């Protein structure tokens, strides 16, 4: 009885309620987990770090990542460090777009990060200003997109990939793996 009205909660209704809310809760938990455990100092950050241009993040108001992928961990990493930046991930492939959008919309960065299903060449970069940043994933065929950004916008544009491979060499040394002269692992 609630407000003088009697409700009959059948077992079937209760199961539907629990099934709906457990799935909704699961999506939220996945999104929070993805946000919290996103790689620190990911590719976007490393790209500017290696070029010694980290101060660009402080002045930036909009950041775009072309080829944001299945899991936009780089955008999550930047959101944790620079809350003032509005970010946009552009992804062309439907399944990666859907998964990425679900992670963003269920997490704490949903007001600052948006994911679009679009080819990077079709995006209008003309509204970007001097302090804005565009990163193109190394997985994307970047030549045409790079030219378009340079021709139509004032934004800084970078290919989001390591330029200096020293971090990779350091990681390999820390792994304690032994390699033969052909680069194959010979001991765990």
What are these regions (language model features)?
Residues 59-71:
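Conserved class I S-adenosyl-L-methionine
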Residues 70-83:
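Conserved SAM-binding loop of SAM-dependent methyltransferases across substrates and taxa
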Residues 143-188:
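C-terminal substrate-binding/active-site "lid" region of AdoMet-derived donor-dependent transferases
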Residues 86-91:
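Conserved SAM-binding motif I beta-strand of class I
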Residues 93-95:
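Conserved SAM/SAH-binding beta-strand->alpha-helix loop
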Residues 100-101:
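Conserved SAM-binding loop
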Residues 1-58:
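S-adenosyl-L-methionine
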């Amino acid at each position: 009885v609630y407000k003088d009205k009697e409700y009959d909660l059948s077992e079937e209704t209760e199961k539907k309620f629990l099934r709906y809310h457990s799935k909704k809760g699961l999506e939220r938990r996945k999104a929070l987990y993805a946000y919290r455990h996103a790689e620190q100092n990911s590719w976007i950050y490393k790209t500017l770090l290696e070029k010694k241009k980290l101060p660009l993040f402080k002045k930036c108001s909009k950041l775009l990542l072309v080829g944001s992928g299945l899991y936009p961990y780089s955008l999550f990493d930047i959101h944790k460090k620079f809350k003032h930046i509005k970010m946009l991930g552009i992804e062309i492939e439907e399944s990666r777009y859907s998964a990425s959008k679900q992670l963003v919309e269920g997490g704490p960065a949903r007001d600052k990060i948006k994911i679009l299903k679009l080819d990077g060449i079709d995006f209008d970069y003309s509204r970007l200003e001097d302090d804005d940043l565009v990163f193109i994933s190394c997985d994307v065929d970047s030549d045409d997109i790079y030219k378009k950004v340079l021709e139509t916008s004032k934004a800084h544009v970078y290919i989001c990939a390591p330029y200096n491979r020293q971090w990779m060499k350091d990681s390999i040394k820390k792994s304690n793996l032994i390699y033969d002269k052909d680069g194959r692992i010979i001991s765990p």
